[in-house]
Swiss-Prot record:
Annotated residues for binding of ATP: 12-19
Alphabetized GO MF terms: ATP binding; guanylate kinase activity
Record-annotated Guanylate kinase-like domain positions: 5-184
Protein name (database record): Guanylate kinase
Organismal lineage: Bacteria, Bacillati, Bacillota, Bacilli, Bacillales
The keyword Nucleotide-binding is annotated on this UniProt entry: yes
Similarity-based family: Belongs to the guanylate kinase family.
Swiss-Prot/TrEMBL catalytic activity: GMP + ATP = GDP + ADP
Main location: cytoplasm
Amino acid sequence: MTERGLLIVLSGPSGVGKGTVREAVFKDPETSFDYSISMTTRLPREGEQDGVDYYFRSREVFEQAIKDGKMLEYAEYVGNYYGTPLEYVEEKLAAGIDIFLEIEVQGAMQVRKAMPEGIFIFLTPPDLSELKNRIIGRGTESMEVVEERMETAKKEIEMMASYDYAVVNDVVSKAVQKIKGIVETEHLKTERVIHRYKKMLEGLQ
């Protein structure tokens, strides 16, 4: 029987650097995760590509996927839908492949209910002023939207206790090392490896 893969869920407030950390994790030669690309109805930012950063879809297409039960999770955030297609995630986990989700906090809580065995990591900013500077630095939102995102971020940070781990994103390379350590630790938990030793003992009988 193939050992089921780990589901690693990374989320945190808007502007905390989830995408940057996720990219750094996947560039690290010591990691071997598969990445589940999220679907969204928001417009692409400069440099983003459909099917690489997100699946950019219309609101109608997204809502049909919800009705058809094809979304593992979804949330509406600042007027746009974000979500994770279910089929790809299930296929990879069943094949024993670790899969990495980078999603919004609302969506992470839905995944927590659907797949409580997942590993949930909350990425935090060093402080709120730094978070605000990062959002402003994107240059893609009006100050009204920035303030809206900050209010949402405060509420999301209060939900940190619902996660298994918290990682501060002050230096990206340090955040990546911490995430790698978390995944390595999870793979060593006895409930994941004990079946191997049971088979070994059976072979000695």
